[in-house]
Amino acid sequence: VTWNLIGERALVIRGKDGKIRAFHNLCKHRGSRVIADDAGTCKSTITCPFHGWTYNLDGTLRGASRPSSLPKLDPIEYGLPPLEMDIWNGFIFVRFQPGPQPALSDILKKFDNEVSQYELFDLEPTGDGFWTEEIDANWKCVRDVDNEGYHVPMAHPGLHDLFGQNYYDEPIAGGLSRSVGSFDSGDGRLWSVRNYKKLLHAKDSLDETHQKCWLYIGVFPNLVFGLYPDSVIFYQEYPVENGKTIQRGGNYKYSKEDREMKISRYLSMRIDRLTSK
């Protein structure tokens, strides 16, 4: 998997040993991008399209073209430049600049007990995996608004019909936040809400409370996880220029999703997309 972020290029790959590693998506020779596709499968090696340097899937240099014209190259020193990487419940995070801050999995550890019942290890992406949307607003404005539920009654008729007054935000120290929308006791005014409540097939591993709520976990500065009884999403914002933002996210379903849960996931998506114009 590759992606670009504000001038940086990242590559995440699983080696033959099954281990996941992250690298800068550039050749150690001249900085050319070694993988052009967004996602795919590398059979055994990665070859730079510029000068033909070849790398093993663990990032080490396998060989350079015309080796007789070059000095002996250490396979680690001249391998793909590594990135700091961390994994939390199957979600992979990379850090372009090493820092003293703790690993994200340590920061999010306070949510582990609650999140464990969602069995995130059983998720698989829907559709093409990731989606992007361009927004004509500064990324900080997008994030500031999304971080508070004060706007929900006016801006999100679907969520307001689903939750009623049962939505609250819980700021947590360390750049974290937790927001919960518990289902209102009524049947619902909107078609999608009425049928979602009627047909909802929640994940069996969830307790009674989490079978009837949507849980959001926010991570400063730009990441949100949405954990629903029928599916899981994430989304984040990246600045492009002043007044323009790219929002990127992913939608996930459970691997053993049956027809009822698929319908529930479809309805929850409809509810989530209902916004005031």
Predicted features and spans:
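Rieske [2Fe-2S] iron-sulfur-binding domain
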Residues: V1-P98, P102-D112
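C-terminal catalytic domain of Rieske-type non-heme iron oxygenases
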Residues: D86, F91-K277
